[in-house]
Structures are given as C-alpha cells and as structure tokens.
C-alpha cells in the first residue's frame, strides 16, 4: 500500500500520458482454471511497490507460493519498486506489462477503461469472493459498455483486492502520557474523554486536546520543545468527516464550493493559524509526517496497517496506538470517516492462457489463502482480506501472533473497514480519485491551495474554493468525456 504521510501542503506529480491503445488484449487462447494442474513450465513477472519492509514481505510470500505442492512448474520473478516511481515505471512498460501487477485504486479506472487489464471473472468463484470484504471486491468491477465502476449487470471483475487500508489517527502513547504527567492532567479523565477507540473525537474536542498537550508558553505559534500536536492533516479525511465530497456521485459536478467542504479545509488550516498545534507550512517540506512521528516531534499523525511493518522493523522506542479520525460535531450528518485505500492484483490483458492461469493462482494465493493472509498480518502488512479472520483471529489475536505488538486497538481498523450504521458512527470511504478517469486533478488542487496561501492565512478556504471551482469543473467534464 502506498504511504500517505506527505504534508497536506505538498503537491504530487501530474498524471501521466493517456494509456489508450498501449496494451490491449493479445492472443487469449482457451481459459485454463487456476485450480487445474499446471504441467508446463511457465514464468510470470509480478510487480509491486512499497518500502523495503513491504518488498521483503512479498518476496517471502512469493517464495512460499513457489515452494507449495503443485506450483513446481511456476517461476515468479518478483520486482519490488519504490512507491514514488512505481506508476511511472508501469506506464513506461505499458506495451509490455508484467503478467501480474499492483494497481492502485485511484488509477484503476484509467487503466481498465484503456483495455490494459484482463477480465478475470471466469477465474474466480462467487463462493471465494464471498469470503472477502464486499467493498474490496466491488472496487475492481467495471462495466466497459457503460463505463461505470462497481458491480452491475454486464460488469466484469478486473482485479482481486490486495487489501483495504484504513488511514487512521495514530498517537505516540509514551509521549502523550509523559505530557499528561508533566502538565498535571488526570490521565484517566483524558483517556475517557478523548482517547476512546470506540468513540471518535469531535473536531472541537481534538483541538482542545492538542492545545492542552502542546508546550507554547509565549503563544508564539512555535512549541517550546519543538514537539507539535499533529504532523499534518489528511484533506480527504477532513472532507469526508464533515459529510462533504469533491464532487457528486458520478464525478460530473464539482462540490468544492459546498459549505461543508469549505469548513473542512478551513478546519485544517486553523490547526496551524489559530491553534498553533500543527506543523506550519514553512516546515512541512523539511520532514514528512512519518519521519516526524518516528522522531517524536509530534504527538499525533496518521497511519495505515501497512506501516506496522516499518514500525516493528525500526523497533521504535515508544508505544503507539490508533484512534478513529475526528469529525465535525456541529454537523448532525457528519461521522468519523477515514479514507480507505486499496490495491488490486491485476492481470495484463496481453497475458496468454497459461500465464493467466499462473498469475491468477498467485493472485488468489496472496489475496485469499488463509496461511498467506495470516502471514501478512503477522508481518505487519495488512488487515486480513478474509472477513472471518479479520473479525476474530486478527481482532482478538487468537493465534498469539501479535502479542506485545502495537497498536493495541487494531479494532479501530476493522471498525473503519466495516462501515457505519445507525449505532456505529465510525467508518471509511474510498479515496475520491478512484471515481475519476485520472488522478492528477487531486495534486493540481493541492498545488493551487498551497500557492494561494491557505496554509499561511493569505486567503480563506472559501475564497480559494470559489475561485478554483470553474477550473475544477472543466477538469471533471473533460474526464467524463474521456470515458465516452
């Protein structure tokens, strides 16, 4: 899963060139079931991304797959690529794709609509899919006739979910406890009021807590000990947790001028401009949120399940835990809503019958094999894709594989994936870029609000959003046109 610890003020690279015509279907041949014996030798290339810990985890699982009985004739060449360059590398190879590769959810629509991905519906049984998180499976359905995402009549399945990754609030418990003691606060009261894994804080409570914890005696906006309350704030999380969005349901009309959206952006800016508890924009480029958190220069940040692999590998000298993301308590329709990222295991449309069978055997092993899923969560890679495993074995550590490992409240990740209900106000939502033809618009938006001075107080969120709305609407209209 791609790391998203970058500061909210930073802009990413623009989307790459169109994929149309780059890698359409090649000679297909008959369908070979992944369960049938593979008696011919076949080599498949499998590309993934991630930090070194994630790459090592995947090499371990690939080696185990090849060693299993029945896979003797399958050779998997695994290539782990840094997340910052993965999509650039994949685009450069679009005419000669690996047989199996990661596809981030926010690039899925562009690639599937270009014909680069194989429809794998015939290679998976409904009974197999029913074991997985429904929303994870739904993300990789696409109907080429109507150019629509999700399960529908005529839609095909173009990927198996690698994972669902809720990006939730994380705090340095050791640092927080020391700060509570230093300030003479009542620890039991603080935890009961603010730090409950089953009840999210409101924005107002979160701001209050951060101001209590930050040392800024002269109120000059700079902590006396260089320890900020929070490293940065995830824009999508703030927007979702105020019942807002970037556009309407079919991504055809902008919604950045809605008051809920504007209030969400201003909430983030005010953490620095008014409360002085978040790292200011001038310092955001000096150090990313992940590094700042690991270096204990902030109490709160954000993390996903995949970050455990790095934390455990670093053997960090503090205890950490996670919480549901805060929401706007003044909005009766708002709920704690983290963004939930995902990757798909996708097969190249040009893979032949034997390659496809081998690639699907590996994809199914990584996605839904019980032993593989157990190994993944033990390695700190993900919440299990298997719902029964996630909601019992993983949640309660019935196998004893997570004893002594943070976070203690990993139930927050499961709760976020599980979604909301009348009684459950904690949930998650796929990132908005998933719904659009390309994802570059998001980085363009971040660049614009940065250049316009939202984070430095030169302009308000309302001024910036209203000024940018016509340009954003043009981009949405163009992307819809690209889908036909």
Write out the residue ranges for each language-model feature:
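Hinge/lid segment of periplasmic solute-binding proteins
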Residues: 105-168, 204, 321-326, 405-408
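Short helices/loops that flank or line small-molecule/ion binding pockets
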Residues: 86-97, 114, 175-176, 205-213, ...
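Extracytoplasmic ligand-binding clamshell segments of periplasmic binding protein
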Residues: 83-93, 222-227, 232, 241-319, ...
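Helix-loop-helix "hinge/cap" segment bordering the ligand-binding cleft or interdomain interface
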Residues: 123-127, 144-234, 246-282, 349-357, ...
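Extracytoplasmic/periplasmic substrate-recognition and gating elements
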Residues: 72-75, 151-155, 274, 314-388
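Long, aromatic- and glycine/proline-rich binding clefts that accommodate carbohydrate-like moieties
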Residues: 323-325, 377-454, 458, 478-484
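Beta->alpha turn/N-cap motifs
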Residues: 51, 103-107, 232-235, 286, ...
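Conserved N-terminal structural module of periplasmic/extracytoplasmic solute-binding proteins
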Residues: 4-11, 19-116, 128-131, 180-189, ...
């Amino acid at each position: 899963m791609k790391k998203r610890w970058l500061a909210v003020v930073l802009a990413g690279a623009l989307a790459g060139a169109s994929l149309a015509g780059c890698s359409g279907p090649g000679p297909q041949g008959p369908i070979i079931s992944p369960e049938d014996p593979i008696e011919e030798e076949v080599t498949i290339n499998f590309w993934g991304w991630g930090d070194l810990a994630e790459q090592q985890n995947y090499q371990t699982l690939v080696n185990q797959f090849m060693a299993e009985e029945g896979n003797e004739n399958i050779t998997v060449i695994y290539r782990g690529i840094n997340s910052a360059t993965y999509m650039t590398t994949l685009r450069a190879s679009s005419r000669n794709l690996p047989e199996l590769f990661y596809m981030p959810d926010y690039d899925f629509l562009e690639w599937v609509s270009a014909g680069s991905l194989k429809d794998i519906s015939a290679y998976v049984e409904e009974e197999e899919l029913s074991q997985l998180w429904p929303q994870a499976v739904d993300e990789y359905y696409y109907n080429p006739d109507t150019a629509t995402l999700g399960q529908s009549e005529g839609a095909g399945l173009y990927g198996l979910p690698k994972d669902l990754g809720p990006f939730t609030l994380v705090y340095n418990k050791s640092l927080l406890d020391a700060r509570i003691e230093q300030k003479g606060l009542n620890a039991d009261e603080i935890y009961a009021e603010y730090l409950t894994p089953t009840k999210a804080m409101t924005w107002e409570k979160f701001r209050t807590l951060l101001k209590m914890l930050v040392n800024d005696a002269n109120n000059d906006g700079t902590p006396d000990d260089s320890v900020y309350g929070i490293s940065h704030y995830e824009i999508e999380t703030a927007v979702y947790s105020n019942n807002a969005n970037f556009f309407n349901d079919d991504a055809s009309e902008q919604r950045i001028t809605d008051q809920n959206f504007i209030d969400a952006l201003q909430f983030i800016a005010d953490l620095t401009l008014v409360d002085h508890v978040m790292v200011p924009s001038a310092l955001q480029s000096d150090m990313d949120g992940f590094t700042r958190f690991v270096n204990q220069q902030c109490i709160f940040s954000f993390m996903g399940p995949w970050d455990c692999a790095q934390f455990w590998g670093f053997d960090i000298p503090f205890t950490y835990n996670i919480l549901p993301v805060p929401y706007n308590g003044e909005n009766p329709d708002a709920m704690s809503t983290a963004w939930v990222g995902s990757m798909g295991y996708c097969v190249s449309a040009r893979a032949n019958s034997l390659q496809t069978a081998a690639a699907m055997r590996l994809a199914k092993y990584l996605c839904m094999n019980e032993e593989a899923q157990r190994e993944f969560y033990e390695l700190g890679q993900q919440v299990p894709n298997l719902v029964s495993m996630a909601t019992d074995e993983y949640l309660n550590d019935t196998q004893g594989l997570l004893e002594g490992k943070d976070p203690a409240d990993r139930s927050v990740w499961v709760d976020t994936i599980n979604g909301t209900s009348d009684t459950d106000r904690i949930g998650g939502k796929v990132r908005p870029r998933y719904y659009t033809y390309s994802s570059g618009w998001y980085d363009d938006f971040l660049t614009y609000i940065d250049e316009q001075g939202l984070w430095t107080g030169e302009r308000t969120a309302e001024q910036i959003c209203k000024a940018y709305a016509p340009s954003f609407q043009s981009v949405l209209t163009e992307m819809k046109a690209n889908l036909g």
